[in-house]
UniProtKB/Swiss-Prot annotation:
HAMAP family tied to this protein: FlgH
InterPro entries: Flag_Lring
Source lineage: Bacteria, Pseudomonadati, Pseudomonadota, Alphaproteobacteria, Rhodobacterales
Record bears the keyword Membrane: yes
Task of the protein: Assembles around the rod to form the L-ring and probably protects the motor/basal body from shearing forces during rotation.
Assembly with partners or alone: The basal body constitutes a major portion of the flagellar organelle and consists of four rings (L,P,S, and M) mounted on a central rod.
GO biological process: bacterial-type flagellum-dependent cell motility
Protein keywords: Bacterial flagellum, Cell outer membrane, Lipoprotein, Membrane, Palmitate, Signal
Gene name, Swiss-Prot/TrEMBL: flgH
Compartment(s): Cell outer membrane; Bacterial flagellum basal body
Topology in the lipid bilayer: Lipid-anchor
GO MF annotation list: cytoskeletal motor activity
One Pfam family hit: FlgH
Protein name per Swiss-Prot or TrEMBL: Flagellar L-ring protein
Species the sequence originates in: Jannaschia sp. (strain CCS1)
Lipidation (S-diacylglycerol cysteine): 19
Amino acid sequence: MNMRVFIFLIFAAASVSACGRLASVGQTPNLTSPADGNEVFAMNVVPIPDARDVPSRTEGASLWTSGRASLLGDRRASLRGDILTVVIEIDDSAEFSNSSERERSGSEQMGISNLFGLPQRVDGLLTQGGSLGEAVELDSASRSSGEGAIRRNEQLTLRVAATITEVLQNGVLRIEGSQEVRVNNEVRELLVTGYVRPEDISRQNAIEYDRIAAARISYGGRGLITDAQRPRYGQEIADTVLPF
């Protein structure tokens, strides 16, 4: 491929990806509509009733019923469309350090002093005093060293409402929650998905993040501050393409 064509394709791809952002210059970032999400779908679409469910028998002389609306009923989320609170309290720290060093050297020599008189004949043909007695001499040496360190300290405390989007056959609940907050020209987005057991939900209808299986927690944003922290398209392309 011609180098000019390659450079033109790179600039064309960068220009196309930037067109969408140019349309929002001078405007505050829009919030996404929850109408198309799985949470609203789970709240509005009635699930197919399970044939194994047996309606509870109401005692005629009893003052209390066993339903969720009763005074002593279990109001924890358990059905599709129910809402529960996810408590996220992350306080992690990690520190790793490692170093490595490698060194290697080698030397090879080879010469032909006598071989049926052939070396003497060849020496007469070589220029600048060359001789087969010192025909080959190789020296090699290599050395590499590396050192790395990782230090992380992360703290995140959030609470978000999530919706049960699916009840699996083994009783495990699939939850999904999202939250968007716009402050000036910056939108903060929080997404939570995962699987929980009904017995892990507290009496306050809340569950901690470390009890969510296959948890996917995303906390980010979009807006002017996020754009300022992100490298330019040209820099990202150069970091990906350039081998040095």
